[in-house]
Regions:
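Thiamine diphosphate
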Residues: 2, 6-15, 19, 25, ...
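Short active-site oxyanion
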Residues: 30-31
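Acidic carboxylate-rich catalytic motifs and surrounding loops in phosphoryl-/glycosyl-chemistry enzymes
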Residues: 34-39
Length: 169
């Protein structure tokens, strides 16, 4: 489906109000993503094929795509797991002096990158994070919370988003 809202209207009324990913979160076996770049989409499709056809998992994927023309960068090294799990650092801040952490996904990510450039021009360091799936991050957080509760607090796994952002200021 085309994302809609931030650029051209989505394909079909269900995509024009921006809540299709919220609706997708209510379906337990729906894996939803809102990628920006071609390499993100490639990693997601490869993962989907592996899970659905090789591993025979009973899941399906809902992926929103964009309808704008823009340059797609090469995939940074080592981001595949982050793409699959829902978040990865796209751009490290130029300075470690309390950098701003900017998160974006889908159509808005490119504007987030522009905001980081503007902040850098004002001597404000900014890191950019691509959030490919808020739903997968939520699902992981809930699973960690559940495991902690079921173990009586003996196990306390850290959600992936916390692992990624905890060293950020």
């Amino acid at each position: 489906a085309t994302s809609g809202r931030t650029t051209l209207n989505g394909e079909g009324l269900q995509h024009q109000d921006g809540h299709s990913h919220i609706l997708a979160s209510t379906i337990p076996n729906c894996i939803s993503y809102d990628p920006t770049y071609a390499y993100e989409l490639a990693v997601i499709i490869q993962d989907g094929m592996k899970r659905m056809y090789e591993k025979k998992e009973k899941v399906f994927y809902y992926i929103t795509s964009l309808n704008e023309n823009y340059v797609h960068p090469a995939m940074p090294e080592g981001v595949e797991e982050g793409i699959r799990r829902g978040i990865y650092r796209l751009r490290e801040a130029a300075s470690n002096n309390k950098p701003v952490q900017l998160l974006g996904s889908g159509a808005i990510l490119r504007q987030v990158e522009q905001a980081a450039e503007w902040l850098n021009s004002k001597d404000i360091a900014a890191s950019v994070w691509s959030v490919t799936s808020y739903n997968e991050l939520r699902r992981d957080g809930l699973a960690c919370e559940r495991e902690t509760m079921l173990s009586g607090g003996e196990r306390n796994p850290e959600p992936y988003v916390t692992t990624q952002l905890k060293h950020s200021q």
